[in-house]
Amino acid sequence: MRNDNGRKRRSRCIWIILLSLLLLGGCAGVPTKARTYPGFVAVVPGDGETLSGLAKKYLNDPSKGWVIGDFNGIDTVKPGDRVIVPLQPPPPGGVTTRGYQTVPVLCYHNFSLTESGKMIVKRSDFEAQMKFLKDKGYHVISLNQLIDFIQYKAPVPSKSVVITIDDGWRSTYDIAFPILKAYGYPATLFICTDMINNPKKITLNWDEVRELKKGGMDIQFHTATHCNLAKSVDGETASAYFNRLRQELTCSRSYEQFGLKKEIRYLAYPYGDTGPLVIAFLEKMGFDGAFTVKRGSNPFFVDPYRINRSTIYGDYDLKKFEKNLATFSSKAMR
């Protein structure tokens, strides 16, 4: 009964605000007008107003424009629009009466100016995919935001997506990074430490890795040698296998020697493969999350050490690309 009464009070409050918005509507074309109610502000934006501007004014955080947009079902505001600004943040987890929110994590590997292959995405295709995200109203969020969502600490925009790149190919620096910067998208690069400065392959060097980090790219790890952590090799004893796991993961955490002054928090499994022993090692070593290449989006209740990622192959057109962007599930939680 208490919950029903609370919903009724909230409903009455919103109806009062909507009526207020109708009365304020005549103020369009002049500076923003607003009226404050418990938990909400009724706003009719003036000339030049934006969602981020409203968020800065009423929520004290311009990055929370998405909260206003999600609440009102809009991507932008125009003078004369009738907008409700919720003063309380949405609950974490994205659970509604219709289902629950999911966050897709995209996985790229290598890029090329003119050619594509299974693991190589052509520059024009990558740029078209980033433009598609913008045009369709997706919000590209950081890995830290994703983990806060998974840990039920903070909400994320309703159409959130994460971008990751594996290995450490030079094309990340030459091709992907400029495009990501142009769109203002955060992204994470999972590097194999032994792959950097490799004279036999076209890979990044440590100066370029540092420059990527300085430019805003999150640098995380993909082990030292890209070996399969979940399988022992032929003739390998249990003791040797344990030592190899420890060496692969400890080497990956030796950030200081590369001039990258912070500890890593996340691992991308080579080949997406993991198991209980590998996860136990990660937990004991303080990793906060780890990523597979199992295709699918992630609800807040996903195992943080088995986070799904969808590999974007070089032959994907925009229809195939879009199939990897599910941001809501109507399945019942049981």
Label the predicted regions.
Residues 32-34, 81, 87-160, 316-318, ...:
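N-terminal pre-catalytic segment of deacetylase/amide-hydrolase enzymes
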Residues 101-116, 157-161, 169-275, 301-307:
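Metal-dependent polysaccharide deacetylase catalytic core of the NodB/CE4 family, i.e.
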Residues 24-26:
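C-terminal motif of bacterial Sec signal peptides marking the signal peptidase cleavage site
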Residues 45-49, 58-63, 120-127, 170-171, ...:
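Soluble non-cytosolic domains of exported or imported proteins
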Residues 1-11:
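N-terminal secretory signal peptides that target proteins for export/translocation
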Residues 52-57, 66, 70, 124-135, ...:
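Solvent-exposed, polar/charged alpha-helical surfaces in well-ordered, non-transmembrane soluble domains
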Residues 30-35, 53, 60-98, 307:
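Extracellular LysM carbohydrate-binding repeats and other cell-envelope/extracellular binding modules
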Residues 11-18:
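Sec-dependent signal peptide recognition
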